[in-house]
Amino acid sequence: MHDLWPTILLGIIEGLSEFLPISSTGHLLVAEHWLGERSETFNIFIQLGAVLAVCLIYKERLSSFLFLWKDREKLPYFLKLSVAFIITSILGLWVKKMGWELPKDLGPVIIAIFGGAFWIYFTEKVSSQRQSFVEEISWPTAIAVGASQVVAGVLPGFSRSAATILMAVLLGVSRPAATEFAFLLGIPTMFAASLFAWIEETHFLKNPSLDSPLTLATGFCVSAVVAFISVKWLLSYIQTHTFIPFVWYRVGLGFFLIALVALGWKTQ
């Protein structure tokens, strides 16, 4: 059981930070510094655990997409999700083809954390001037949200949730509607990204993970449970609150990471 504590803690951190607009990357970097770096396969499993939580929360919405031929009113929403995902996929593959790689030090992550804080603050200030918000996702909004996922992907620390949710809010969508669209879009996006990363990691299944099945299962389950709780909380919170508190949390996280760098900590 003692050997599983690092796995449990990393699962908790992933579950808390994956869908909140606070950046899972920044938190996992710090955690893995003290708990030990984990394999890409382990990271994929805890991310999939978080995705499963969102699937369970939106199970009715997702199941309704299986019967679009019965309920045509949901077809436009499904098509907008599909187009947003396609845009994310095309732009993501283009960025990958250009040779982009994840940064190997904390500098770019810290910049992205502060950049995400500014993005949230700016969007909330602009949206505070609006007299009303819309509940429907327009085609321009769907396209913009799909593109914004790529920004979060190339700037680890920015936060996919912060990029997508706040993009929709900036374009006049209510926080609950923006969050739902962003989370539903995140399901196929994160599944696809996890599959792509897994294939790369295993070199087409020729180099299997050294993690034990117990380790992978524990990380997956812990992440799923914690993500379920945190997403449920967020969906309730945004009914009556703004995202401004996350700005100050991110600023605090950014300065904490700066302090670590000043003390000589490196990720390599």
Swiss-Prot record:
One of its GO terms (molecular function) is undecaprenyl-diphosphatase activity. The keyword Cell inner membrane applies. Pfam families: BacA. It catalyses: di-trans,octa-cis-undecaprenyl diphosphate + H2O = di-trans,octa-cis-undecaprenyl phosphate + phosphate + H(+). InterPro entries: UppP (IPR003824). It is a multi-pass membrane protein. It is found in: Cell inner membrane. One of its GO terms (cellular component) is plasma membrane. The chain crosses the membrane at residues 39-59, 75-95, 106-126, 179-199, 214-234, 243-263. GO terms for biological process: cell wall organization; peptidoglycan biosynthetic process; regulation of cell shape; response to antibiotic. The keyword Oxidoreductase does not apply. Keywords: Antibiotic resistance, Cell inner membrane, Cell membrane, Cell shape, Cell wall biogenesis/degradation, Hydrolase, Membrane, Peptidoglycan synthesis, Transmembrane, Transmembrane helix. Coiled coil: none annotated. Its EC number is 3.6.1.27. Bacitracin is thought to be involved in the inhibition of peptidoglycan synthesis by sequestering undecaprenyl diphosphate, thereby reducing the pool of lipid carrier available. Belongs to the UppP family. NCBIfam families: PRK00281.1-4 (NF001390). Catalyzes the dephosphorylation of undecaprenyl diphosphate (UPP). Confers resistance to bacitracin. This is Undecaprenyl-diphosphatase.
